């Protein structure tokens, strides 16, 4: 079962938190889900080169907070915050309500499964050999200190007439172990021969503590006590 199901969905409430955090009325549920999908698609298209690894959407009665986790936050913010204001206006026009945008930096982009999948897809579109693209991403992830990584590509690889699936695995990726922290990413490469699907699983270690850990908040720096002369 662990081999087939989405590893993030399987671990929700165990060691993964939801990416859409809100509680609507039952009648408004389809509308909110569709709106979240629109926001994610818009941001992915608008900020493709910023290297977005995750988008978290939180809602209150009248406000909407969007947290964007990106490898290159400077592209989103722009000079003196000009680009982020334009983005905010576009999002408000899209959803029709007040939007707050929070930007977080992805500190280890090589260890993000979504960014790794997009990296392989980009290389395939540039006609790089699929084996070379996969090995390059695996080496980068291992340097970032991950415990294991699996990369899978499926489609008309190398322009072959018949589609097939190829994958590489380095280290451990225990998909059945629920306490294992598994990151998962998917991307599509649009080539002249057709669409090639890219899937990446990254094992980051085991979470032995039960429940979802709260996100770490930045603590104010304490000043060192002055010495009396």
UniProtKB/Swiss-Prot annotation:
PROSITE patterns: KH_TYPE_2, RIBOSOMAL_S3. Residues 39-107 form the KH type-2 domain. Keywords: Ribonucleoprotein, Ribosomal protein, RNA-binding, rRNA-binding. GO terms for biological process: translation. Part of the 30S ribosomal subunit. Forms a tight complex with proteins S10 and S14. Binds the lower part of the 30S subunit head. Binds mRNA in the 70S ribosome, positioning it for translation. HAMAP family: Ribosomal_uS3_B. Belongs to the universal ribosomal protein uS3 family. This is Small ribosomal subunit protein uS3. It comes from Nitratiruptor sp. (strain SB155-2).
């Amino acid at each position: 079962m662990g081999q087939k199901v989405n590893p993030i969905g399987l671990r929700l409430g165990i060691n993964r938190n939801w990416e859409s955090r809100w509680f609507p009325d039952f009648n408004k549920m389809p509308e909110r889900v569709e709106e979240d999908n629109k926001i994610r698609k818009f941001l992915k298209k608008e900020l493709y080169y910023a290297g977005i690894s995750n988008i978290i959407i939180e809602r209150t009665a009248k406000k909407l907070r969007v947290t964007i986790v990106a490898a290159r936050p400077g592209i989103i913010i722009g000079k003196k915050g000009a680009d982020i204001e334009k983005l905010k206006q576009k999002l408000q026009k899209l959803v029709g309500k007040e939007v707050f945008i929070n930007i977080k930096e992805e500190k280890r982009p090589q260890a993000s499964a979504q960014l790794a999948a997009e990296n392989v897809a980009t290389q395939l579109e540039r006609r790089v050999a699929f084996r070379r693209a996969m090995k390059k991403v695996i080496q980068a992830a291992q340097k970032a200190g991950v415990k294991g990584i699996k990369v899978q590509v499926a489609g008309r690889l190398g322009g072959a007439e018949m589609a097939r699936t190829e994958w590489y695995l380095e280290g451990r990726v225990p998909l059945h172990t629920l306490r294992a922290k598994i990151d998962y990413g998917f991307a599509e490469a649009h080539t002249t021969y057709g669409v090639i699907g890219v899937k990446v699983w990254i094992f980051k270690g085991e979470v032995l503590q039960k429940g979802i850990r709260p996100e770490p908040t930045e603590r104010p720096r304490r000043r060192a006590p002055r010495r009396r002369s």
